[in-house]
């Protein structure tokens, strides 16, 4: 719609195309391939035609069969495979119509990066009327849900919010991950990061 397209996650042609590009990147020297938008579209289904019927079981099957094959082929070249997913799947077991399920997807990646951006949580999430203004509590709660569901710390590497937040609020994003002994990535669409985000990092890591 509006000139934008989603590939069908069940299409062998599309899947092989993506895997082949990932393998080329490995051969060029990159040590990790992270799959973004590893999901079904979340709206406007009336415009879409899928190879398989758009059911929960088929969505989960297609996302994970792609990752399973991709991981096998990419790992064989010495590269890690990771994926970023919506933060809500850490807490909810339903896939939200997009084919992301925590227990299955974690088995088919080396690392998982849930996008636990506080601004993306709705009012009342984890008991916060304004989740975006409570980054530490929101992220801690989301990560606790993942760890409680058996995700290993070494595989969990959240995306943190590097936009719409002050330096102090980004620091709270980071502190939430550091307090769980997790690696993390900060996301900003323009790749613009203030040094102030990281001013307290040494003191947290030396605890």
What are these regions (language model features)?
Residues 1-24:
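Active-site-adjacent "subsite" loops/lids of carbohydrate-active enzymes
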Residues 20, 24, 62-72, 76, ...:
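Alpha-helical scaffolding segments of alpha/beta enzyme cores, especially the outer helices
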Residues 109-123, 132-207:
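Substrate-binding cleft of secreted/luminal carbohydrate-active enzymes
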Residues 8-16, 57-64, 133-140, 167-171:
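Soluble non-cytosolic domains of exported or imported proteins
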Residues 28-58:
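Active-site-proximal loop/short-helix segments
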Residues 34-35, 59-99, 152-165:
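Aromatic-lined carbohydrate-recognition surfaces of secreted/lumenal glycan-active proteins
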Residues 1-9, 43-53, 126-128:
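Surface-exposed, active-site-proximal loop segments in enzymatic domains
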Residues 18, 25, 36, 105, ...:
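Conserved, mostly hydrophobic/aromatic
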